[in-house]
């Protein structure tokens, strides 16, 4: 970043696509050098082309331009003059006339030459068409009307018995030529040495991250063809332009990914660490001369959802803020991106421009200059200016990037950047992290200072097959790097670290084997966690309905009490989440639908099962909890009063996917104490603690459970309090001991694990028995239906 100051001291040089104002000219004259500023390379190229065109550069009719192109070939098909007019005419003719109409004019000239018995002219016309097919074959593959007209031209030539001419205008060679694979060929790295990189976001160095982002950016940028730029000029949008739309979507995806990665950290210190890391990534991107991704990263860091985080910014050093200010000034839109244009003009070799800025230049040039001059001639200078501008962007695709990308990390980034959120959703997440106050609703997000307008409103249009392909590639990379014993499983700890590379994940992992995750489970996880998947209608939104609660209930979003006589709040019919009316639209937890088992809602529980029936969340083949921090009780069981059931241990799976072991003893409390104050009323709840208590519990029975910070905390927003609702019929008859928490020995933990495993095995046996009964009943039902049908046929 030390070069930014020097760049500001350098005299300004006029660059293409922008007009130097009076102030810029005065500054150029006030330098010590008596010589005027040197023209840019694009200006020199345009001047040389105008000289080579001669009188045509001042303007010419369309027929004169076509005739000059035909006369550029000799009798043997070789160019007898500069090919610059051919290049300009064949690439930019769509501004004046469509490709099919241009070929139709050539057909008419061919017919006239046949009538005048001029075989030389016919041959030159075919040479011109062959040059068109060879150099700009993509037009014949993308333009259906041009292909249809070409077939008519070929039939015309065949009808006149000109076999040699038919070979010249043959288009079957398009699919067999090597250059037809230009758009899909791989990027060649400058280094042959293979290096192993980590797939964990926290372990990735800024240099590695910037190189792989540059790889993805260049891969998308080099697929934009000359025709794509033409289509953008003609349509003034990226509609029906998939390559350019994907490039824009990648830029927006990187910007949103940066915001969400910062917001995914639960504490201001951790958010500041991610913020600082992306500043270092931006510095590396500037060194790589990747201005487009640099714009996306800085735009994400300057977004209002990040800049409003005052607590986070207080942990960012002054030096980092200074670097951010320099980057923001470099990419500022002031004076038509003057700082960026000067820095970009000084770059040589590999560089990726800010595509939006140059597309705006193309549109400005296209709208400012007329297509025709006053005498009806074609404005050749406009065609030249547009051609030079587009050709400069296309030539950048031939310079290989100075980096070596890791395929596995590319797959991981490709999937993680596919996440898509709206501006309002991101701002709600920011507001949930650092609320301004408890009453004010979230404001409408403001535009970031460095994000260009052309990129807004462009959303990716994926399909399930594309998402599935990205997920499968990423999963293959994960197991290749982390499944060293090749048993088809990775550990829970490794998975949590890998999942930290994704901004927000909303589902709890099931495990076929304790502490291990299979390939199918991790694939299902990322398919479900994909935000685009949710946008396709396959997500899990809440189904809130206004509800009247018969018992005191708390809001699962803000932990506040639901006041009122009737219709106190809203309840999700699928997962059972309760919340205030004002909290309904602020809930960021994904709906986790409950399995249709004979479970009883928390409002209607009249009996409690032994504590051994409580099962840990995330354990496969057991009851699935509807949401984090809640329990499901089976109905119809008899309360066991043995010593074994009085003192049990349950396993809670917190929002960071780490297990919290809690030793509980059965307790009772009067049901009228739900709204009494807790010991910390008037102060803040102790940090690092979850609150586990019954809503019917008195203040003396509050239980504190220490929860150490996870090395890779989950991005899911932590609720202020989690309540376990349970009660006992005997609570009105005989009081029981209070809830108790103590540290346990290793032997006790081992005994508890063995007990839980035995309970798990017993439940599996019961489940298999129930499944067999269901199958037998279904078979009996089918036989009964068939018997009735046979009886009906007999009668």
Swiss-Prot record:
Q: Where does Ca(2+) bind?
A: 483, 485, 487, 489, 494
Q: What does this protein do?
A: Functions as a calcium- and diacylglycerol (DAG)-regulated nucleotide exchange factor specifically activating Ras through the exchange of bound GDP for GTP. Activates the Erk/MAP kinase cascade. Regulates T-cell/B-cell development, homeostasis and differentiation by coupling T-lymphocyte/B-lymphocyte antigen receptors to Ras. Regulates NK cell cytotoxicity and ITAM-dependent cytokine production by activation of Ras-mediated ERK and JNK pathways. Functions in mast cell degranulation and cytokine secretion, regulating FcERI-evoked allergic responses.
N-terminal Ras-GEF domain boundaries: 53-176
Name the organs or tissues of expression: Specifically expressed in brain with higher density in hippocampal CA1 and CA3 fields. Detected in interneurons and projection neurons with no restriction to any neuronal type or neurotransmitter phenotype but not detected in glial cells. Expressed in the hematopoietic system. Expressed in several neuronal types of the hippocampus and entorhinal cortex (at protein level).
UniProt cross-references to SUPFAM superfamilies, sorted A to Z: Cysteine-rich domain (SSF57889), EF-hand (SSF47473), Ras GEF (SSF48366)
Q: What is this protein called?
A: RAS guanyl-releasing protein 1
Stretches of Basic and acidic residues bias are at: 1-12
Source species: Rattus norvegicus (Rat)
Any idea where the Ras-GEF domain is? 205-436
- Which residues does the annotated region (Ras exchanger motif region) include? 57-110
Give the Gene Ontology MF terms in alphabetical order: calcium ion binding; diacylglycerol binding; guanyl-nucleotide exchange factor activity; identical protein binding; phosphatidylcholine binding; zinc ion binding
Chain segments carrying region PT region: 717-795
| Modified-residue entries (Phosphoserine), positions | 597
* Residues bearing PTM Phosphothreonine: 184
Region of interest (Disordered), ranges: 1-37
Explain what switches its activity on or off, per the activity regulation comment.
Autoinhibited. Activated by diacylglycerol and calcium binding, which induces a conformational change releasing the autoinhibitory state. Regulated by DGKA. Regulated by DGKZ. Regulated by PLC gamma and F-actin polymerization.
Please state the protein's primary subcellular location.
cytoplasm
* Occurrences of domain EF-hand (ranges): 470-505, 506-532
For membrane topology, the record states: Peripheral membrane protein
**Where is the region Suppress the PT region-mediated translocation to plasma membrane?**
686-694
- What are the coiled-coil residue ranges? 738-779
Q: Which UniProt keywords apply?
A: Calcium, Cell membrane, Coiled coil, Cytoplasm, Differentiation, Endoplasmic reticulum, Golgi apparatus, Guanine-nucleotide releasing factor, Membrane, Metal-binding, Phosphoprotein, Repeat, Zinc, Zinc-finger
Q: How does it assemble?
A: Homodimer. Forms a signaling complex with DGKZ and HRAS. Interacts with F-actin. Interacts with SKAP1.
Q: What is known of its domains?
A: The phorbol-ester/DAG-type zinc finger is the principal mediator of the targeting to membranes and is required for functional activation through DAG-binding.
The entry's localization annotation reads: Cytoplasm, Cytosol; Cell membrane; Golgi apparatus membrane; Endoplasmic reticulum membrane
Any one of the GO BP annotations: natural killer cell activation
């Amino acid at each position: 970043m030390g070069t930014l100051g020097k760049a500001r001291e350098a005299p300004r040089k006029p660059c293409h696509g922008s007009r130097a104002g009076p102030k810029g000219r005065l500054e150029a004259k006030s330098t010590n050098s008596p010589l005027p500023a040197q023209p840019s390379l694009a200006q020199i190229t345009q001047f040389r082309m105008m000289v080579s065109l001669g009188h045509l550069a001042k303007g010419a009719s369309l027929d004169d331009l076509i005739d000059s192109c035909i006369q550029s070939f000799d009798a043997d098909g070789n160019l007898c003059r500069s090919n610059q007019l051919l290049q300009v005419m064949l690439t930019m003719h769509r501004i004046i006339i469509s490709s099919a109409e241009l070929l139709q004019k050539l057909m008419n000239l061919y017919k006239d030459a046949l009538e005048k018995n001029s075989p030389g002219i016919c041959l030159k016309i075919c040479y011109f068409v062959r040059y068109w097919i060879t150099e700009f074959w993509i037009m014949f593959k993308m333009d259906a009307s041009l292909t249809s007209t070409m077939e008519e031209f070929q039939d015309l030539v065949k009808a006149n018995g000109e076999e040699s001419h038919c070979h010249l205008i043959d288009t079957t060679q398009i699919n067999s030529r090597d250059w037809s694979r230009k758009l899909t060929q791989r990027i060649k790295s400058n280094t042959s040495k293979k290096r192993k990189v980590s797939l964990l976001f926290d372990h990735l160095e800024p240099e590695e991250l910037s190189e792989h982002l540059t790889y993805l950016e260049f891969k998308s940028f080099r697929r934009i063809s000359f025709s794509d730029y033409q289509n953008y000029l003609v349509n003034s949008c990226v509609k029906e332009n998939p390559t350019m739309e994907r490039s824009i979507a990648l830029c927006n995806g990187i910007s949103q990914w940066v915001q969400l990665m910062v917001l995914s950290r639960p504490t201001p210190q951790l958010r500041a660490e991610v913020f600082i890391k992306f500043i270092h990534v931006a510095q590396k991107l500037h060194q790589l001369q990747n201005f487009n991704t640099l714009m996306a990263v800085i735009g994400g860091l300057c977004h209002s959802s990040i800049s409003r985080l005052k607590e986070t910014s207080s942990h960012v050093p002054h030096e980092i803020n200074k670097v951010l200010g320099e980057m923001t000034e470099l990419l500022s839109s002031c004076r038509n991106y003057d700082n960026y244009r000067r820095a970009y003009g000084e770059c040589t070799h590999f560089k990726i421009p800010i595509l939006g800025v140059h597309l705006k230049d193309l549109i400005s040039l296209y709208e400012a200059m007329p297509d025709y001059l006053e005498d009806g001639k074609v404005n050749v200078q406009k065609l030249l200016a547009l051609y030079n501008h587009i050709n400069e962007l296309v030539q950048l695709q031939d310079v290989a990037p100075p980096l070596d990308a890791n395929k596995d990390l590319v797959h991981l980034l490709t999937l993680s950047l596919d996440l898509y959120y709206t501006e309002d959703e991101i701002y709600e997440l920011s507001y949930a992290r650092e609320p301004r106050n408890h009453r004010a609703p979230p404001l409408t997000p403001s535009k970031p200072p460095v994000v260009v307008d052309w990129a807004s409103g462009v959303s990716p249009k994926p399909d399930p097959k594309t998402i599935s392909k990205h997920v499968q590639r990423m999963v293959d990379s994960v197991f290749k790097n982390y499944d060293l014993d090749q048993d088809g499983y990775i550990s829970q700890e490794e998975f949590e670290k890998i999942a930290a590379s994704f901004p927000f994940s909303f589902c709890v992992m099931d495990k076929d084997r304790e502490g291990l995750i299979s390939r199918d489970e991790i694939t299902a996880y990322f398919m479900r966690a994909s935000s685009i998947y949710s946008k396709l209608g396959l997500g899990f939104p809440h189904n809130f309905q206004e509800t009247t609660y018969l018992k005191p209930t708390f809001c699962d979003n803000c932990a506040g009490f639901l006041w009122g006589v009737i219709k106190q709040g809203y309840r999700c019919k699928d997962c059972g989440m309760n919340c205030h009316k004002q909290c309904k639209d602020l809930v960021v937890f994904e709906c986790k639908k409950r399995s249709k088992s004979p479970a009883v809602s928390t409002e209607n529980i009249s009996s409690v099962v032994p504590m051994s029936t409580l099962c840990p969340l995330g354990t496969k083949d057991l009851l699935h909890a509807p949401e984090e921090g809640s329990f499901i009780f089976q109905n119809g069981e008899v309360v066991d009063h043995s010593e074994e059931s009085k003192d049990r241990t349950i396993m809670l799976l917190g929002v960071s996917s780490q297990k919290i072991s809690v030793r509980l003893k059965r307790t009772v409390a009067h049901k009228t104490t739900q709204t009494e104050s807790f010991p910390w009323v008037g102060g803040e709840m102790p940090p690092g603690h979850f609150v586990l208590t019954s809503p019917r519990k008195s203040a003396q029975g509050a239980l504190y459970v220490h929860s150490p910070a996870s090395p890779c905390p989950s991005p899911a927003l932590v609720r202020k309090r989690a309540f376990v609702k349970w009660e006992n019929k005997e609570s009105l008859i005989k009081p029981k001991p209070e809830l108790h928490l103590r540290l346990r020995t290793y032997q006790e933990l081992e005994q508890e694990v063995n007990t839980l495993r035995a309970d798990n095995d017993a439940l599996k046996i019961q489940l298999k028995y129930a499944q067999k009964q269901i199958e037998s009943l279904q078979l009996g039902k089918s036989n009964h239906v068939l018997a009735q049908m046979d009886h009906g046929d007999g009668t």
